[in-house]
């Protein structure tokens, strides 16, 4: 019986790094609390938007081909016309310049995983690069 216990430890120790890697992956899946706190009141809990007032996120090019523009829109806000899906809307979105890079990464990861075209997350380094290139 003691031999069985001794044989279990190498197996447990061998699996431990894989379990640690898997638990780390969960952290990069995005945090709905940032979205719920800053975005859901206008864009809706399910990203559906609000009729002609606020655009839906479910069919947004900013979560696909134009993902590099999203950090600038979030940090600077939007005033005026914006193309969303098949429509052009005249909107006012407040700036969220106070979000940290970590919060921005969490928010964009959450958006990508829920409504993005590829369902991929982006790195904090990439977000920082995009923010440096904002107009």
Label every PLM stretch briefly.
Residues 26-50, 66-76:
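Sequence/structural segment immediately N-terminal to covalent heme-attachment motifs in c-type
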Residues 51-58, 79-134:
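Axial heme c-ligation environment in periplasmic c-type cytochrome domains
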Residues 18, 32-35, 127:
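Residue-level signal for mature regions of secreted extracellular proteins and peptides
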Residues 2-14:
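Bacterial N-terminal signal peptides that target proteins for export
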Residues 21-24:
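C-terminal motif of bacterial Sec signal peptides marking the signal peptidase cleavage site
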Residues 1-2, 26:
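N-terminal hydrophobic targeting signals that begin at the initiator methionine
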